[in-house]
Amino acid sequence: MVQVIRIIEAEDHGRERSHAATMPGVTRPEAQLSARHISGVAPGGIEYLWERHSEATTSSVIFPRRRSADVFVELQDDSAAMGWLTDAPGGVLRAVRVGIVETEAEAEAIARETGFSEVDLVSCHIGKVRIWSDFLLHGDGFGRLLVAANGLAPLDLGRLVQRVQELGNYRNMALLGLPMAQEKAREVADAEAAVVDIAERMARGEGDRALLDELSALASRVTSLTAATAFRMSATAAYTSIATDRLAQL
């Protein structure tokens, strides 16, 4: 499976939905431009999934089962599907190739041979399943998640992979608030220092009128700061909650 999550600007929504409905080899009369979910299966068994979220969209391509050695390899027959996946509008927030094999022995061989960074590679068990990732972008611009099913039923395995992907996706969505937090940190520190200064001057008995004017100006600055950050910080809190929930489910 290959999955890409993108941030889409409002003016690109129509173009993006139109692109989503052009899944190669898939005829979906119900894939209307207003749909938030579009999916289909092309001849040869390649599955396509597209879903619109509040701020982002997730596009996924699920390839038919292939040799273990090829789970991260882009084959010639994959070109149309990968073209659909990579040509969509919007800024890429996260792009991951998920390789699924039957056993840990197969997965360990792949981890040695397919460019995982030995220094950064981590692995863990989730029930029967074991997963590996080095959390790096590789030469093709995708991260890699390697999964050994170890006998887990296909439906349960699908749910587990979905939760792992959602954990990573919502974590990255939460991090959209980091640049703003860093940018506004100085303003917050300045406001805190101003409050301390005014309090100290009040204790010394300075003129009430001047202090009142400064407090009014400070309140206005804080109100503007709150308004400028409210949406992004609220979204960050919501995405963090979802990521935490997915982690608890795992």
Please report, for each region that a protein language model flagged, where it lies by residue.
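N-terminal pre-transmembrane cytosolic regions of membrane proteins
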Residues: M1-R97
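Membrane-associated alpha-helical segments
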Residues: E214-L250
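Alpha-helix initiation and N-capping motif
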Residues: H13-E16, L157, D208, T240
